[in-house]
Amino acid sequence: MSSNKARAVVGALVVVVAVVLLVVLKGNNNGDAANTDGGKLQTIVVRNAKPVGGIRQLTYNKGEQILFKVESDVADEVHMHGYDIMKDVKAGGSVTFDFPATIEGVFEAELEGRKEQILEMTVNP
Amino acid sequence: MSLLHALPLAHALVARKDLPIPAWLFAWAASIVLIVSFFALSAAWREPRFEEEHWRPIRARLSRDLLGMPAQLLCGAIGVFLLGVAVYAGIHGTEAPDRNFTITFLFVTTWLGFPLFSVLLGNVFKPFNPWRAIGRTVGGGFRVLAGQRSAHLPYPERLGRWPAAIGLLAFVWLEIVYGANGGVSVGLEPHAAAVAALLYTLYTLAMMVLFGVEEWCERGEIFSVYFGMLSRLGCFGVSEGRLGRRRPLSAATKWATVPGSAAVVIASISATSFDGAQDGAFKNGIEHTFHWFVDRGVGLAGALHITDTIFMALTFLGVAAVYLIGVRGMSTVQGAPPAKKLRSGFAHTLIPIAFAYLVAHYFSLFVYQEQAQFTYLLSDPLGTATTNLFGTASAGIDFKVISANAIWYVQVGALVVGHVLGLTLAHDRATAYWGDYRQAARSQYWMLAVMVAFTCFGLYLLSVANA
């Protein structure tokens, strides 16, 4: 009998720990869906064939409009992977990307010729 | 960070990376795992149920057709042909990994496809194994010409499956460390993959000459051992030359009787863990170590290879340590068999965990890349835009086929199911080893801790992927 009691206690403890874990982690999750880059024009500046300030991170929710401009001092092709959009940019010129966030996931944009990543884009559901 | 990006970046094989699982899902999954584990302990059975296979043959005609010589010849020929195509495309095709047949065929279609089909349909790699097909054909030819069987050296029993375990680590090292130019999943170049396939062919055929075809496939041939291990989970198997059905999981209980088997399954878990962690959980550690080597004058590529190798080795040791601690704990329970018997006796309980890790980490890659495999990679295997064999050379991958939510549920579902199956096997083995079911249940607190550790680690890896 006592071993059954011990089991009941351990079982109750496990459930309590699980519920606490759930509540704590669930609480953390609210809020990160609100602040996205949706619909705002973002500019990625490329100097010496590298993105200024490192690889740019942009976050969207599915259905929002993705809008960013690449200003580059080198001529190359900007490739938005996953969405598979490619646009040429001239040295000293700029190119604008404007498309809806239809595919969820994490995607890269790079200077295709140089294999230089300039953007990491996250689209949340 | 900046230094890592000074390295030439290879194209990631797949353009869409998985989103990390959200915290609420992590919490749900972890909670379910804890609760299920607890009830598994208290409500469990007292007599072993999986030690016997309860094997029943399927219809004799169907079995004969599937296992007969014509089918064996056909499957073997297909295997040899596809290996040939992969080597040819690797050597003569483009060096862009995502456009060349070779990389996707070897590292996605074969490496991830056979585990799936092995679990569902049984040991399907065996008939398609190109090296076994070549070995048996040559052996058969020798028998006809010389009128006697070829003599082989006796395989050293103590080596067991260690060659396969080491080979498995070497294969994954080749896939994600050797070719990794800045942390992409499959950074290996097609030419290198083709050369590696040729070298492995030579090595395998040499070992088959030494020890015999079936002997080497059972112990040392990486892919036979690995896919064969996973096929033990399913309900189809061959016994005495006949195909039959058995109780699912039951064949796994007899798998780890050969030395080194635990190392194979630990190698599998650690390889998948390392691949999942290098871009997420280990990212900071890898960067830190990488800079440490660079500051001491090691070249960039060399520093990255050394760092990745160290982290991969540490992952293997870490996974092994968790398992060995569990074994050690069990050996303190009254009536425990010797530690050596425990060590090999519970190794098979990790097979479902290994498969769950595989599904969780590569499910989406498989879904995307198989679209490429059966469209443009089939029509234009060299990736040079010179052929369009089936008219599908200009097709692309539809990344919309699975939503982020669907991927998350598959990932978490795989880990939870793998956890339950692992616990099931462990509990069942304990009831076989401990006559007294109370002691058996007590020993299982240790295996429960091991399984919870692996499952929560797996969930953790998914929750920080690409962070």
State each model region's role.
Chain A
Residues 35-65:
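N-terminal edge beta-strand
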Residues 56-58, 84-88:
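Beta-strand-rich interaction surfaces with strong enrichment in secreted/lumenal proteins
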Residues 56-74, 96-110:
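Beta-strand cores of secreted/periplasmic/IMS beta-sandwich domains, seen most often
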Residues 7, 21-39, 89-125:
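Extracellular/periplasmic metallocenter environments
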Residues 11-21:
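Core hydrophobic alpha-helical transmembrane segments of single-pass membrane proteins
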Residues 2-13:
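N-terminal Sec-pathway targeting helices
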